[in-house]
Structure formats: structure tokens, C-alpha cells
Amino acid sequence: HVAGTNGKGSSIAFMRAMLEAAGYRAHVYTSPHLVRFNERIRLAGELISEAALSALLEDCETANRGDSITYFEITTAAAFKAFAETPADIVLLECGLGGRYDATTVVAHPALTAITPVSMDHMQFLGDTLAEIAGEKAAIQKPGVVSVIGAQTDIPLRVIEDEASARGASLHRMDVEWTASREAEHLVFDGVRRFPLPGLPGPHQIANAGLAIACIDKL
């Protein structure tokens, strides 16, 4: 279960690539989509068909019986129904907005949680300060569940650490419990493990790929 401001989609893409390369079937739920709505849901590696997604949304609308529901909530319900009906080994789940009240946080016992870099975003919903925003995202952490933390500035890191302590989560932080850096044409994880450079462009992808490796290590 992945929250954060920047790098959620990239980190999930790296995790999916590693899991599939190892022979695992991964369901994926991300947002927003770039071109087509069905890009948000992958079932065991394949994009859900538009027809299947439309049918799932109709089922969810019927089950909801006219109660108030948001666009993201009904899409999340459709994704979860699709996941329940299709065999796979793992679900990679991205928060849509914040974390504390996000529809994806209905998952009570995730295998692990991850928080990518936190910065100012969605202030009208999450709060006016970096600490408030970090607190909303840090609320995905669960008792007894490892929380893998990406690169953070001081304020978000302190909030995440405090929230983890209050919730009984186990922290696995970048530059504390694990490291990722570029050395020549390799990504070096924990100072000794060498990987090819990420296929996605930008120096920030070193940290995103490092987070993905740290998550896979803890699964």
C-alpha cells in the first residue's frame, strides 16, 4: 500500500517489473490514468478491458443502492471486486488522495506500507502545512506492519516517525535502514548490491527504484 506526493506510480512500476520478472502475478491499482480510464487497473499483469471495467462499475453502482459515493470510491470498489475475482499473488495499491481517509485504506492488514517523498499537495483537502499533509499520508501505517520510507525532508520524516511509533509500525527508512545511490552506470543498493540504472528517466528515479527494492526485500 503506497502513499506519498511524488514517485508513487514510478515506485509501483518498478515493483511490478521486479515481481513479474520473478514469476509473480501482480494486480495493480494506480491513479490518475494518462489516456484511458482502464489504465488504472491491471489484473495479473494485463490491463483490465474497458468492457469488464464497465460491467464492474455497474455491479458496484447496483450494490451501492443510490448512496452517496465518490468517483474514486466506486472505482476503488470496482478494482477490489476485479482483484477478488482474478487469481494473483500480490496487489500493488496506490493511495488516491492523502491516506487517512483514502478509499484504499480500507485494507486493514497490508503486507507492507510505503511512503514516497512528501511535499505540499492537495492543500484544500489535506491541510495547509507540510506537517499536516505528512500526517494524513503517514496514517496508512498499520500495527506490526513494515513501513518503507522514501527520501524525506526533516518535517515529513519526523511526522512519519511519530505516527509509526503511535501505530506500532516498523520503520525501514531511506538513508537510515537502507540506501540507494548511483555509481557510474549502476544503481547501488545498501552500498553493495548493484543493479542496472532505472529505465525511467530522471535522477529522482534512483530513489524511487531504491524504494521499490526496499519494499520487495521486506515482502
Predicted features, each with a name:
Residues 15, 79, 160:
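Aromatic/hydrophobic pocket-lining residues that form π-stacking "cages" and hydrophobic walls in ligand
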Residues 21-108, 124-126, 132, 154-155:
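ATP-dependent carboxylate-amine ligase catalytic core
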Residues 64-69, 197-203:
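A short glycine/serine-rich beta->alpha loop
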Residues 26, 200-212:
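Short glycine/threonine-rich catalytic loop with a Thr-x-Gly-x-Asp
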Residues 18-22, 82, 215-219:
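Active-site catalytic microenvironments for nucleophilic, acid-base chemistry
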Residues 87-94, 110-196, 209, 213-218:
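Acidic, Mg2+-coordinating active-site environments of NTP-dependent enzymes
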Residues 1, 70, 147-150:
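Short catalytic-loop micro-motif centered on adjacent basic/acidic residues
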Residues 1-34, 39, 112-114:
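Walker A (P-loop) phosphate-binding motif
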